[in-house]
């Protein structure tokens, strides 16, 4: 935002520009993957940590709204437990690390309610929820549907 503030000669023009922009938000992948595994697991239960991440996302989205942003596409987190890095790093059985996917699902389950709450409380805002978890899950479960 600092760069944008310098580009516009006054705050009203910046606010108008931001109100016409679409913001793509992808949040919490690193937090729910390696960061939780290495650092946060000792400090928080996954329920508490997921709520903490949602609270932080809420603050950041409200801050963007205050600056003038009105249109948001907010994606949830993909099934991190199926990513090659996680699969090759963490001992597990099955094709994916289900403990991590359950962790991601806890966070993802909280996201739609947050977006509905924000849209109803922030006048003129539009929040669209992108379910990339479902998209990735479909690719992992039916790779043949996407080519040979």
Where are these regions (language model features)?
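Oxyanion-hole/transition-state-stabilizing segment in secreted/luminal serine hydrolases
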Residues: 2-51, 63-66, 70-89
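A short acidic, glycine-rich active-site loop
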Residues: 45-52, 95-105
């Amino acid at each position: 935002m600092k760069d944008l503030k310098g580009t516009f000669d006054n705050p009203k023009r910046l606010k108008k520009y931001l109100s016409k922009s679409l913001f793509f938000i992808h949040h919490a992948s690193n937090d729910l993957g390696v960061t939780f595994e290495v650092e946060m697991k000792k400090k928080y239960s996954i329920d508490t940590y997921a709520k903490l991440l949602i609270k932080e996302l809420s603050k950041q989205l409200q801050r963007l709204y205050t600056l003038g942003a009105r249109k948001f596409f907010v994606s949830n987190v993909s099934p991190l437990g199926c990513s090659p890095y996680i699969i090759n790093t963490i001992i597990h059985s099955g094709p994916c690390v289900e403990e991590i996917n359950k962790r991601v699902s806890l966070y993802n389950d909280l996201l739609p309610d947050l977006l509905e709450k924000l849209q109803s409380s922030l006048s003129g805002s539009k929040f669209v929820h992108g379910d990339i978890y479902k998209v990735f899950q479909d690719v992992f479960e039916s790779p043949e549907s996407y080519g040979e």
